Amino acid sequence: MIAAGAGGLLARGTTAVPAAVWAWAAAVAFAVETGCRAAGLVHDPAAFAALRLVVVALSLCPTMALLGAKRPQHGVWQFIVGSLAFVLAMPAVSATLVRPGTMPDVHALQRWFMPLLVVVGWMNFAATRHGPSAALVAIGQLLLLRPFLPFAAEAAVGGPLSAGPMSEGSISDGLGAVLVALGAMLAAVQSVAWPAVPRAGLQGRAFGNDRAAVADPLAAIGGPFLALRETLGAAWTLRIAERFNAVAETRGWPCRLRFTGLEMGGDPHDTSWHRDAIRGGRALLRRFVSDDWLRRHERPPRLSAEKCPEVAPAGEGR
């Protein structure tokens, strides 16, 4: 819960905040499930399975929230995310209200869809600096999802969830929870201690960073683009790069956005295209972030490409 809250603070000003809220909700649900099991408030294996399915449904919401994180529809998209969570948890609701005492009847398609969504969430960040964190979270999610994976025996849904503290299911649950928490905390610590872009912060304001950024595409576009890549993952940043590069090619700008940052070519003394390129790049970025966020993640003024190898060439683009 702490890591999810920290993620929400770090993502403020972006459309990734709802994903952090969903992650916090999933953490609360898992804490409630764990508390009920520890206090002995729930004894029925079917009730354990229903609670776990609700936790799993909520844990998949952050990935879906990120896939729709573009303004202006990102707010309405949360209703779709909530509907998905309800549909995934429907077998638990049905078993509890309609057939009390029976195991949730999870359809085979849902058993395949849930781990597929976990893999999609991992792939979205696999090529970013948060790749190791995403891998830890994905493995932990699969362990928590284990009773509802394809080909899982129905007995495994009730047995491990209701067994003793040293049972195979309890150990798997504990390991899964630890991996998810570790991955989330690692991502939060990495974002604070090792940001993708040296933040301009007070130094940038003191030296007129806003004015410098107007003349420097590396500061105005490359820096925020890399920071957004670490926040939203590959899906949207590659789309931003594709749109920017299409406009750049049409208008003859000697620059291209790659997954590793902004590549600039041509005559270094020719700045006639800078203002238009910055305006176009910022327009694309504003679909996901606020102006204040853009200012916070611009590179410090006069920071050369040689001092920022991750923004300058090169790397493979889309």
Please report, for each region that a protein language model flagged, where it lies by residue.
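Membrane-anchoring hydrophobic segments
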Residues: 1-88
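Polytopic alpha-helical membrane-helix bundles and their juxtamembrane interface segments
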Residues: 164, 174, 235-238
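Intrinsically disordered, low-complexity terminal tails and inter-domain linkers enriched
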Residues: 160-172, 202-209
